[in-house]
Amino acid sequence: MQTPTHPPSEEDRRETARLVKAVEVVYEDDDLIAFNKPTGLLIAPDRWDRDRLNLMRVIHERWSPEYFNAHRLDRDTSGLVLCAKTRATLTALCRLFEKGAIVKRYRALVRGAPPERAGLVRARVVPDRFHPGRMCVGRPGKRAETRYEVVKAWRGFTMLRCEPLTGRTHQIRVHLAHVGCPILGDAFYGDGRGLMLSEIKRRYRHGADAERPLIGHLALHAESLTFEHPADGRAMEITTPPPRAFDLAVRYLDRFAG
C-alpha cells in the first residue's frame, strides 16, 4: 500500500533542491561512472513512497536513464556509488562485488573508542526481531567481518577507517556499536546525537537560540573503492572526501578535545 502524498512544503522543496545539487560525478569513463551521494538521499525508490526523491532518479534525469547502480549505500551514509553504463558492465561489477574483489573503505566518526588501535570485528548479523528494519549481532545470523583502524583520537571521540569484508545490511554501524563506539548521529545503533560544541568546549555559553550540532547527520562516509576495471583489468582507485561537516567536527575536536 502506497503512503498518501501531500504537497511538499517550502522546506521540503529547498531540501530536495539541496540534495539534487549535491550529487556530483567523481569519476567517469566509457563503461562506468561514480557519483558522490549526499547524506539523506535514498539510492533507489522507496517501496512505500514511489515519489520520494532518490539517487537513481536524479541520475536518470540529470545524466542518463541507461545508468545502473552496482551496489547500495544506506540513505544516511554519504559517499561513493558506482554505476554501470551498460548491462554487460553492470553484470561484471556486480560479480566483483559478490566476490569481494572491490575493496570498500569508509570513514566513521564515533563516540568513544574501539578496544584496539586496529582490529577485526567478527560478529554474525541477524535482523532485529524487536525493531523491524534494524539489524543486531546474534545467531544464527550471517557471517560478517569489518576491519578498522584509528585515524585520529580525541577525548571521548575517534575517527576510524573501516573496511567491510562482507556486505551485510548496516554492517559497519552494527559492528562499531557492538564494540562500544557507535557512530555519531546513528539513531538505530546509538543514541542519535550528533557532535555538539557544548560537549567538548569548557565554559560553553549557550545563546538565545537552540544549539546546532557541528555534525548532525550519520557520520559515516564511503570514501574509496579499489578494484580492477572490468573492461581492461587496469587498477582503479576512486576516492571522494567526506562532507564539510566532518572537517568542521575535526577542527573543533582538535581545538577543544585534543
Regions found by a protein language model. Give the residues of each.
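Short active-site oxyanion
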Residues: 79-80, 234-236
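Short, surface-exposed secondary-structure junctions/capping segments
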Residues: 198-203, 252-258
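A generic structural motif
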Residues: 111, 151, 163, 228-230
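RNA pseudouridine synthases
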Residues: 1-145, 152-154, 176, 241-257
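Short acidic/polar mixed-charge low-complexity motifs
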Residues: 31, 142, 156, 168, ...
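Pseudouridine synthase
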Residues: 52, 155-225, 242, 246-247
